């Protein structure tokens, strides 16, 4: 095979150029991400049962939906939560590799079968099925420089204008409005209702009947009478818009012509649709959008599309509101930085390899031959990644960095052996190359097979570990196989055409720096040879040292801490604020002000968005979350300015707040695997002992975990049972 390309160097160049061309075209098509898509596909069902307790939501909504989710293909597990705010959430996790669109369709079909058994109010308020991870890709906050603009006004603009625009971006799983728009609020007066013998249901019926769109048809519509001269659309009643229109709704009328209007029994005002969640940007009222990534979508491309859409919409913001867009939490810059750093390391590795080759070969032509093979093999590897549907991520790039040293070895072996044959047998470069390839072709293939046998098994790992290392394995194996291919095609052709017989004689005659280096290297080689001879002469002592080294390695392996992936400074932090059960929103807001005051004083913090009422385990008045955007890494290069150090200091300092527990933490190392750094543990009532016993077991487990010195920040992400006021209805009265 090698002789064929030695005699046809142009054909070897054509193959190399085709490999480079295919790889170069593939680079622009490959997605960029920090890690392979490790998180399994998830589908989330959300429902709202306004006014219901957590127990009622669980019995009449959550369990009904859970019981229907049977027979779903590749469903791994399912979790659900019910809150006293009347919300229910069911998360279904599927096996890795499942098509998220198919999973969502199957869940939607199952949900339709359960809808008839759900309360009417749940059906009317709607059930949503979304595919995506539970954590946020980014948080986009809108704030105003005009102090008269309220968070409700901003939230109403987001709901009416921005929400649909961003939801339609490819790769966006869900857009959650962290604020509220306008709604007409009707405050009933019980005394007046009793005076006019009215019930709240009468008010609801009147509103449903009169707050409607009426289709009145057309004037002169076909078939028309003979001589009809005008055709026009008739507009009648439309939906009510102002408080005055609602006040004039007739809620009761009598035969004598007397009517009771809504304003006679209630106070009508324009207010916020919901007061459950309130957002603040750097302590000022705002509204935000929490954008979640769809399962299988690429974070970088989706993030760029969102930013482009926001930039496109900014000129159309209402001028009187003076709105400004702030991306207060963004997970994509760290991904871009990670890829850039790995690409930088790849470039540095290439330069160092070329310099080291020149240092030892001391021949520009001989150095140039292995250097040419590097871009050919690397670009070809990108083509293989595209063929397998992989991405450019830190693991595939790390595999390429590691492969550089391996792939130049093949070319160096060929070049060195050709020079040796030319020097020892006084052959021409062409003949020396032919003879050299006859000698080492089998060795090149053998080396490739041995190295492949080391890395190929990693491609067959199961679970998340397999997903992580499969791309690493395929990348490094494909680079090595391409390296052998190039070493048997292009490298011999280059040796036969570029090397000169005179170059093989110059190595021993070098002077200057290279002469000094050669003499120093020869002395080092002599000392090494004498050392090896000494080891051979004292085998017992050498074997003892070898055993001690093995023992030291084993001890080090056992004692080193282990983790799935290391926690890195992603340029962002999260905080969970939890108040005692039953605490009101005013108490939560007071704690949030203390939290904001502390965090905004920290020199590492750039922006802070705080959201009261939003919790990791559910929404309630006594919980809140915050997302902290840190300054660029170049501005936090000092000691103690890393994200982990900032989080530890903040958690310690804010522990003095007696009315709340505050935990500041880093985002999860891998998107979609948890809501924060560390790991989650869930307890399951397999014995059916009941809710109270399960809560008691949870508290006992947390206390035991806090005593473990290897654990930090042990906490409950769920909401405790809220106080309930039971009303007993006397049906006779």
Predicted regions and their residues:
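Short acidic/polar micro-motifs at solvent-exposed secondary-structure junctions
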Residues: 91-92, 146, 184-189, 195, ...
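A short glycine-centered flexible hinge/capping loop motif at secondary-structure junctions
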Residues: 196-197, 582, 733
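Short, polar/charged loop or turn motifs at beta-strand boundaries
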Residues: 47, 53-55, 151, 188-193, ...
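Surface-exposed amphipathic alpha-helical segments in non-transmembrane regions
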Residues: 13, 20-25, 29, 60-77, ...
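Acidic/polar active-site rim loop that often engages polyanionic ligands
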Residues: 135-143, 186, 228-229, 284, ...
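Short glycine/threonine-rich beta-strand-turn micro-motifs
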Residues: 88-92, 182-194, 288-291, 680, ...
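Hydrophobic regular secondary-structure detector
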Residues: 1-111, 275-649, 653, 665-666
